[in-house]
Every structure is written in structure tokens, then in C-alpha cells.
Design a protein with these regions (language model features):
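Bacterial N-terminal signal peptides that target proteins for export
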Residues: 7-9, 27-42
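Core segments of cupin and vicinal oxygen chelate
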Residues: 62, 73-130, 167, 174, ...
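A short acidic/small-residue loop/turn micro-motif
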Residues: 100, 140, 212-214
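Bacterial N-terminal signal peptides
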Residues: 41-52
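Vicinal oxygen chelate
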Residues: 21-22, 56-63, 67-75, 94-95, 121-137, 146-172, 194-199, ...
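Intrinsic, low-complexity polybasic segments
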Residues: 10-20
Length: 233
């Protein structure tokens, strides 16, 4: 991700240069931010090139290797990071920001947000095996504060694989986390999995899932879903 630091105004030529090579600024603090982003981009590219996973179908996105991360906008990034780290047990890897540009359409052109939007902070966390989670705290003139339900267009949830659903649910309950009904799936291609939904303190929908004996679809499908129980496949 290439995002211009707060109060930094780029010309069209500078924007192109920054996107191409993460150009540093003479200002020390600004240079440090760009260095973080440059290193992140180079690391991600190197990981993709060296990964041993098979490439996607030839008719798909060229060079596709897999799901790198999911971005989630939260109302309070300190609260969100605390929940992911101290309740769920994820690891906070890096944070950077703020970013804004209230003089041009840079933020809209890059991220499809209001041009006067501000990203106050970005924090990336890693939760065991699997893709990373990127947390954003924004402010914007047109910001909506309604969290979508699973039934809404754009509704979403994050699911975590656990070894023991009951133990995980009991733990969440002990932490005061809102949990829902536990469902063991016994029919259909998903038979073998057990799920429980829960809510983060700010309303983000999440799930714990377990299928220690696998799922029914695996007996007939030539393609297997990725699973943190066997991350190499």
C-alpha cells in the first residue's frame, strides 16, 4: 500500500515516483514512514516470488499466489489491537500513519474514499497460521458508523480455526465477549465442522470454527479448501 503522509502534498509526477519506488522525503520523520512502507512492499513481493505454493489458474489474475491480508476499519485502533492481541492471542507486527492529503484527490484516487479522509493509524496483526489482518482507523466527512450485519450487502466476518470449540467459547464467555449458538454441522458438504459466532467489542462479527476430522466435501472434491491445520496444502 502506498499512502502519502499527513500534510504531504504530491504533484502528479511525484505521486508516480512515490508509487514506483517509495521516494523518501528530506524530512526525517516522513522519510522513516516511507522507509517502512518501502520495506513492507519489498518484503511482500519477495515472499510472493519465493513462495512454493502453486500459481492460480492460467485464466485468472496473473501471478496470483494467495490471500495476503484482509483490511478492516475500526472505530478505535487501540481498542481493536488490544482485543486481537490480549483476548484473541494474535501478534501485533507493525503500525504506521497518519496519512492524508486535503489539497488534492490523492486519497480518493488511491483508496476510493473521500479526498479529505484521514487514516490515523494502520496496524497489522498476525493470528497463528493464515493471512494477516490489517486494522485501519479513519476519519472522513462522509464516514458511516453502522456496522453491517452478515445479511447486509458488504457484510463480512473473520473466522478463526480452533482445536476445541467448547473450550474456545468458554474462554470468550469468561472474557465477557458476546457469543452465539454453537452449531455442529452434520449434513451436506460442510458436515464435520462446528461453528460459533461472536462479536468484537465494537460489533465486528467473528467466528470460531473447528473440523478436526475434516469435512464431507473432501471425500469427493479434487480441490481442498486451505486450512490452518495443514497450511502447506
Amino acid at each position: 500500500m502506498m499512502i502519502k503522509p499527513k500534510q504531504r502534498i504530491l504533484s502528479a509526477a511525484e505521486t508516480g515516483a512515490a508509487a514506483a519506488c517509495c521516494r523518501t522525503s528530506p524530512d526525517q520523520e516522513e522519510s522513516h514512514v516511507f522507509e517502512q512502507i518501502r520495506n513492507f512492499a519489498i518484503g511482500a513481493l519477495g515472499a510472493a516470488m519465493l513462495a512454493g505454493a502453486p500459481q492460480a489458474h492460467a485464466d485468472g489474475l496473473p501471478g496470483l499466489r494467495g490471500h495476503d491480508h484482509t483490511g478492516i476499519t475500526v472505530p478505535d485502533i487501540k481498542q481493536a489491537t488490544d482485543f486481537f492481541v490480549n483476548v484473541l492471542g494474535c501478534k501485533s507486527v507493525m503500525s504506521f500513519g497518519p496519512f492524508s492529503d486535503d489539497k488534492t484527490t490523492f486519497m480518493h484516487d488511491l483508496l476510493n474514499v473521500d479526498p479529505k479522509s484521514v487514516i490515523h493509524q494502520i496496524t497489522l496483526v498476525r493470528c497463528g497460521y493464515g493471512s494477516s489482518i490489517e486494522l485501519f482507523q479513519y476519519s472522513a466527512p462522509d464516514q458511516k458508523n453502522m456496522t453491517p450485519k452478515n445479511s447486509d450487502i458488504g457484510g463480512h466476518h473473520i473466522a478463526f480455526y480452533v482445536d476445541d470449540i467448547k473450550a474456545a467459547k468458554d474462554y470468550l464467555d469468561s472474557k465477557g465477549v458476546k457469543t452465539f449458538f454453537t452449531l455442529p454441522v452434520k449434513e451436506g458438504p460442510a458436515a464435520g465442522q462446528t461453528i460459533t459466532y461472536f462479536l468484537a467489542p465494537w460489533g465486528l462479527q467473528m467466528e470460531i470454527i473447528s473440523y478436526p476430522q475434516g469435512m464431507a466435501y473432501e471425500k469427493t472434491s479434487p480441490i481442498k479448501l486451505w486450512s490452518p491445520t495443514d497450511p502447506g496444502k
